[in-house]
Design a protein with these regions (language model features):
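Short, flexible, glycine/charge-rich loop motifs used to bind or transfer phosphoryl groups or to couple energy/partner
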Residues: 1-2, 28
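Right-handed parallel beta-helix/beta-solenoid
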Residues: 2-12
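Amphipathic, hydrophobic secondary-structure cores in small proteins
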Residues: 13-66
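Core SAM-dependent methyltransferase catalytic element
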Residues: 73-78
């Protein structure tokens, strides 16, 4: 992660399943400014499809997706 990808806000939705991670991500993004970066941590495998779909639907940029031991990390730029 470079300097421009430092999250302004972090959202932990570990242990929650669809639709909670997407709903909470959308809510958090709605409270952020243009250009801000949100880091989301989730462990629901459905988020691997849901987060890119959400980003496309609401017009934000999915900067990065990583997976480590069943935990997914998404960096989203508003």
């Amino acid at each position: 992660m470079n300097e421009t990808e430092t999250p302004n806000r972090r959202l932990d939705v570990l242990g929650f399943f669809c639709p909670i991670p997407v709903h909470e991500t959308r809510k958090a993004l709605g409270e952020m400014q243009e250009g801000d970066i949100l880091e989301v941590r989730a462990d629901d495998p459905e988020t691997l499809q849901d987060m890119p779909a959400l980003c496309n639907r609401i017009g934000v940029q999915l900067l990065d997706t990583t997976e480590d031991a069943g935990e997914y990390r998404f960096l989203i730029k508003k």
